[in-house]
């Protein structure tokens, strides 16, 4: 490892906030000055492609590909990501080594005149680029007009101000990290509007075998978050989760026990299947995998054939 630890990140305000939070935690844990770090901004395909849904453009990997290439090439030492944007299959030679303590995993509704989804007028436009959020909105309010909303948090809020839509759904964790929690007009309950696997958690990716970096990260890794994410990502992986599939999953850890709730839903919101499992937190990945097999058996293969 070089004297300066290079932190790779996307250039959006939220991505930079996450990179700087990681830097601050490392500085505090190891008594290091700011000069010991360099935040390296890397433009990704996901940032550049704004005219169509991610599912049509290539999926979640669009937000990580260029950053992971820089990590493999040694241009950066660690990569900081929103965990919900991470594909379940990482490139050879890379691993998710650490997670920061998870923020609030709930989604937030941001409305102008209407303060909740229930308050929206029939036929009102709600913006979202997430298939999961689109499907859940349609399940709650099939009379609404769900429109595609791409861009970072600030771009989406600007579109609301411009009247492109009457409301949108954003991750509450992202709003909090940007100091924008006040724009949330309603918080969506986890049981009604379950989050994406990994939502609210910052993940740190490294080269496999980079012992010096791994040793540094041990001090800031949050074990319960890592266990919850192992479960959620195993659930996603077993269902072939990508941006093409509306999948929700959320695990919580309490005194060494893990509780997981997962959901698969059709894009139009009319069909859904849920699963709930509990078990020892050390069996997190197994629980996630078992939950995926359970919900797949409940739904039947034809359910997936119809929309994946």
UniProtKB/Swiss-Prot annotation:
Keywords recorded for this protein, A-Z: Porphyrin biosynthesis, Transferase
Membrane listed as a keyword: no
Keyword Transferase: yes
Pfam family, one: Porphobil_deam
Modified residues annotated as S-(dipyrrolylmethanemethyl)cysteine in this record: 243
Signal peptide: none
Name this protein carries in UniProt: Porphobilinogen deaminase
Organism: Mesorhizobium japonicum (strain LMG 29417 / CECT 9101 / MAFF 303099) (Mesorhizobium loti (strain MAFF 303099))
Gene: hemC
């Amino acid at each position: 490892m070089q004297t300066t630890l290079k932190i790779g990140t996307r250039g959006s305000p939220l991505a930079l906030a996450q990179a700087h939070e990681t830097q601050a935690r490392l500085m505090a844990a190891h008594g290091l000055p700011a000069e010991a770090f360099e935040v390296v901004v890397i433009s990704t395909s996901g940032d550049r492609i704004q005219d169509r849904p991610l599912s049509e453009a290539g999926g979640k990997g669009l937000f990580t590909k260029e950053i992971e290439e820089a990590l493999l090439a040694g241009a950066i030492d660690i990569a900081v990501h929103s965990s919900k944007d991470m594909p379940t299959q990482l490139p050879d030679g890379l691993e998710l080594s650490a997670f920061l303590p998870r923020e609030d995993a709930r989604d937030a509704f941001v409305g102008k005149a209407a303060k909740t989804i229930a308050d929206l007028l029939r036929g009102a436009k709600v913006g979202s680029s997430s298939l999961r959020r689109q499907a859940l909105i349609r399940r709650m309010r099939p009379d609404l007009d769900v429109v595609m909303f791409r861009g970072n948090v600030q771009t989406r809020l600007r579109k609301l101000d411009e009247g492109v839509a009457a409301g949108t759904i954003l991750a509450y964790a992202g709003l909090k990290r940007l100091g924008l929690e006040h724009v949330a007009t309603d918080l969506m309950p986890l049981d009604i509007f379950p989050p994406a696997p990994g939502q609210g958690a910052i993940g740190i990716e490294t080269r496999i075998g980079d012992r010096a970096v791994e040793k540094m990260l041990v001090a800031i890794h949050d074990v319960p978050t890592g266990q919850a994410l192992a479960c959620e990502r195993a659930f996603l992986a077993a269902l072939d989760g990508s941006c093409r599939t509306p999948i929700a999953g959320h695990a919580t850890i309490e005194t060494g026990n893990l509780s997981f709730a997962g959901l698969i839903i059709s894009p139009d919101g009319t069909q859904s299947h849920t699963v709930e499992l509990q078990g020892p937190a050390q069996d997190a990945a197994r629980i996630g995998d078992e939950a995926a097999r359970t919900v797949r058996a409940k739904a039947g293969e034809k359910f997936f054939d119809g929309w994946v």
